[in-house]
């Protein structure tokens, strides 16, 4: 099962999937596709608005069910975690293509509007991964990738001991400080209730199931303390003359983080929001969508010039803002989904701890990460680099990750239990008998969040950690903080469940995240590997932080999800869907997306298939694909990022070329050898011609009939421009 997703990986699929299908056919393997793109998920949710021929199935729900089957084998490419502005763009594009879907209601007042808004909420943020991830995560850099990075090290900015770059976080009133956590002894249910100062109660979440042994947490971030913290950090950034930047995860944490982002925008531009409060209310300015929302709503208004000048003045008076795009004047505060912590912090650390200012110059930076829970890992890395200099990709070790994520574990499953509070009072989490399990005092504007972590995934996670430590003969560190309520519950379980496994001769420790970061970095510089065993958020952060420093990108990681019922989910790298790549392709016919993640995932997918179904041909495809990938890296056939040189389509040709050669050379399967020998010969004889045809297609604007929902035929034509290559491939079908 191969997923159709969004942006650059979607384009790449149009070129690579025909190769995969052609090579799989002689091994009696059928590749099916399911469309889980943002547009596909929107259409699947609104069948009642569509004509019969426009309706499509709900592929995500279907794949979610498949993930619980023992024979599941899913190759999952990155997809958009949609912010509200992206969702609106996708809706407008689909409407323009003749799909009569409704608009996203700004304020849902009628029942119909509430239903529409709830349906759209299902496709916002990281809506795909929690559905498919019915297992924990095993992510590591494959040997071929690590060897390539050592031989061809990526650039690393030099560090200075007197760098002023640092992380700033709250010291009170954040999620970390207010967290309460309990382990539920028997199965039951819970409700979340708000009780006002006047004693009136309101149900925030109706009865929902709890499993025996489940860990539940509640935490609050105080809006007033957040705003006071931001105001003091703005003054500090100005005094220290460093860039001001904010690092959140507004895509995945789709309820809490846009609210935090909006509060930060309001404090930074406090004078403007105070002066134009009435106007902004009339215009429906929503700071959850960032500063960009002010510019969008004021456009064409008689007061546009005045408001824009006020914003400019505020920027001139405040500390310099880190920029997303200096040329276009897009700041860190424009769009919540533009700066995503797991990608932005490693990029900053790799760039000497600096971000870009309005003039496009690299400057020392204050990185605001409001909640303390994980901010320390980045500060520890910065401190280490200030003391020891930049890490060296030629010699550094690796930090593979075993991540707890099955069944929406921890914060990444909290969206349906996260609320902004509208008045002072108390939020109570009660069991079915009305007993209060946890309560939190709250004030207007505070964000309350509850998380759940089921016991079976924790047991599976501990088992996976022990297996990886044993198989790779590497120390494994559980990143858990004894001073944090949730982690204390986890430490108890981890300590208990480790006793169920033979850990003789294994080096397994529990450390808080800061100590674990320093321990891992001290080993990295000696060229030693250390497995990080972490919760769901740290899984996300660490599988970007270390790969970006080690191999230059997280897209080259092997990302395996051994599903708890025996199937396999193979994710193609940990990077996103690269919007800048598709923009460049549409403008000038050059796609710089690197499909290495797809090659690696496909290799382990074939291997899993071969082992589960005893399909020897699948095992041969897996082994030869790995050989081809290694040769592909050795010969440097990844996209060159320059028009007139190899791009994504050319890289696919070379992978197919080397794969056919490996299949022709192998001796384990005579039938495959006989089929691929003439194919390898034809590709060898036509190498120059195919390259010419592929490069000739570059340098021109491309019409693929859409961004979120492109036309299949137009995209296929744009992504498969070599008639010679297509003709040779067709012989396998």
Annotate each predicted stretch with a short phrase.
Residues 689-704, 731-733:
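Extended, solvent-exposed regions of the mature portions of secreted/cell-surface glycoproteins
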Residues 673-681:
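Short, charged, amphipathic alpha-helical segments
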